[in-house]
Amino acid sequence: MLTLSRFNIESGLRRSLPIEDGFMKFVDLDRCYSVSRVSVSNDKELVLYTLHLSAYTSDGTIATEQLTMLINDMQAEYEKGNYCIAGGDFNKDLLVDSGKIFGIDGADYTWAQPVDPTLFDGTNLSMVAPFNEEKPIPSCRNADGPYNDKQFVLTVDGFIVSDNVTVSGSDVYDLGFKYSDHNPVYMTFKLNG
């Protein structure tokens, strides 16, 4: 994971995420997110989270625990008056039903379930799924073989923002999965106040 900024990053921290204890521990990578702090002009901080959450968990419990930990950390920073943005690979179907949107049945691929929207209840945070309704582009393809246009595709890469951040746009760059099993995503935003 890498966080780059043209603004000075004051500090960085790696937070370990929960992982499974059973056999899946040996096939899933140790998961984490990084926390980078950028000072802004109103004596607050822009707190950036770069993440890569688990995909292949036995029952989805660990993935929910990981997302809950991130949401709780972001909410605590928001309550201090800071601006919060998380971005990365959630390994969740951020569009809820990517199979329908992209016209490729994902019934055989159960690893990317939708995000449970109730995880955000009582918070000042919201999910941003990069999407252009006129020309939808997936952010990820299933990596079970070389890329082909019949392969299962979906959007698992996106953002979470605090409500003091206004998002003006978010989409996926269509690179045709030339460099990896992911296409890059972007978000344009402004800090309020």
Residues covered by each model-derived region:
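Low-complexity, intrinsically disordered Gly/Pro/Thr-rich segments
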Residues: 165-176
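Short proline/glycine-enriched turn/loop segments at secondary-structure junctions
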Residues: 24-25, 145-150, 174-178
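Metal-dependent phosphoesterases centered on the DNase I-like endonuclease/exonuclease/phosphatase
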Residues: 47, 57-164
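Short hydrophobic/aromatic beta-strand or adjacent loop that forms the aromatic wall/cage
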Residues: 1, 29-35, 153-159, 181-186
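Structured beta-strand-rich core segments of catalytic domains in phosphoester-bond hydrolases
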Residues: 1-45, 51-53
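Active-site metal-binding loops of divalent metal-dependent hydrolases
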Residues: 51-53, 88-90, 183
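Surface polyanion/phosphate-binding segment centered on an Asp-His-Pro turn
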Residues: 85-87, 182-193
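Conserved beta strand-loop-helix elements of the APE1-like EEP
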Residues: 1-12, 39, 121, 151-166, ...
